[in-house]
Design a protein with these regions (language model features):
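Short beta-strand segments at enzyme active-site cores
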Residues: 40-41, 78-84
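Short Gly/Thr/Asp-enriched flexible loops that form oxyanion-binding sites at enzyme active sites
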Residues: 86-98
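Non-catalytic positions within long, well-ordered alpha-helices that form the structural scaffold/packing
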Residues: 66, 70-76
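N-terminal glycine-rich anion-binding loop in soluble enzyme alpha/beta folds
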Residues: 2-63
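Short, well-ordered coil/turn segments that N-cap beta-strands
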Residues: 36, 77-78, 98
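Short glycine-rich anion-binding loops that position phosphate/pyrophosphate groups of nucleotides
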Residues: 12-13, 85-87
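Short secondary-structure boundary/capping elements
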Residues: 60-64, 82, 86
């Protein structure tokens, strides 16, 4: 059984759509059923990552990212992807809690 991919989006809404398109275009599939099962949560309510990195008195985006990762896992995602450079600043914290 193939794993389901969960994408935490909205931390660059266009990046979310672009990675979705890249996955579809680069998947070697001859029919729809051979594509990667993907769940996209385009959550634009996630606070600005750069603002928090530069000033940690700003709202922390990590709890939002954790919530979305847990939600995607509950929906069946076995792998989580975040198409956002600055979100990767929180990778270790996210990895430890999800």
């Amino acid at each position: 059984m193939k794993k389901t991919l969960g994408i935490i989006g909205g931390v660059g809404p266009l990046a979310t759509m672009l990675i979705g398109e890249m996955i579809v275009r680069r998947t070697k599939a001859e029919k729809d059923q051979e594509h990667v099962h993907t769940i996209i949560d385009n959550d634009t309510s996630i606070p600005d990552r750069t603002a928090y990195i530069l000033d940690n008195t700003k709202e922390n985006p990590v709890p939002y990212l954790q919530r979305d990762a847990k939600k995607l896992a509950e929906y069946g995602a076995g792998v989580i992807c975040i198409p956002c450079n600055t979100a990767h600043s929180f990778y270790e914290e996210l990895q430890a809690t999800t």
